[in-house]
Amino acid sequence: IIGNVSVKQPVIYREEKKEKTEFVLPLKSINSERAKRYLVKRGIDLEIINECINSGLIYESEPNHNVVFLGTDEEKKYKYAFFRGTNDTRFMGESKGSDKAYTFRLLSNNESKRVHLFESAIDLLSYATLLKEKGYNWKENNMIALSGVYQTQKEISESKIPITIENFLKK
């Protein structure tokens, strides 16, 4: 059937392992006033903002005054940082070496099996604000920001679970 054509084995490409980059947190400002103003302007409840700042999950960076959303591992060691500009320019990104297994999250005070997923930290904080406004205890919910859009495959069985969700479900 193939005549004089030679037959070659298919080439197999292996996915290159990415070299781990050292995680670097943005420089922290002496206060978080601009970050607070920005988040309040976005409709986030001030008590929720202050709680996140006091628990070390949000701060304002220097010299650009970005809001920094942090993710920690089980030992409360920082592993992830996402920053967002507080001015009118749409500026955002992840800190060098961030581990997506530990994105920004607010975990329940109790043993809740329910988890709410959000594209971004701002979406997560907006939902917490809505819960509070409706009279619910926002601290009784596991809320995880995916820090980016997640698209499933046509066949759900072929979809990969985002690493931050996989990491949460292992607990």
PLM feature spans:
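Basic, glycine-enriched DNA-binding surface that flanks or lies within the catalytic cores of DNA
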Residues: V7-A101, N109
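Phosphate-handling DNA/RNA-contact segment within nucleic-acid enzymes
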Residues: E62-L169
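Short Cys/His-based metal-binding microdomains
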Residues: I1
